[in-house]
UniProtKB/Swiss-Prot annotation:
Family (UniProt): Belongs to the glycosyl hydrolase 19 family. Chitinase class I subfamily.
EC numbers, comma separated: 3.2.1.14
Catalysed conversion reaction: Random endo-hydrolysis of N-acetyl-beta-D-glucosaminide (1->4)-beta-linkages in chitin and chitodextrins
Superkingdom per UniProt: Eukaryota
GO BP annotations, alphabetical order: chitin catabolic process; defense response; polysaccharide catabolic process
Source species: Pisum sativum (Garden pea)
Identification of the protein by name: Endochitinase A1
Triggers of expression: By infection with the fungal pathogen Ascochyta pisi.
Amino acid sequence: EQCGNQAGGXVPPNG
């Protein structure tokens, strides 16, 4: 939920 689920959340970013 921290990384990848939100836009530009992580690597790779989802938005």
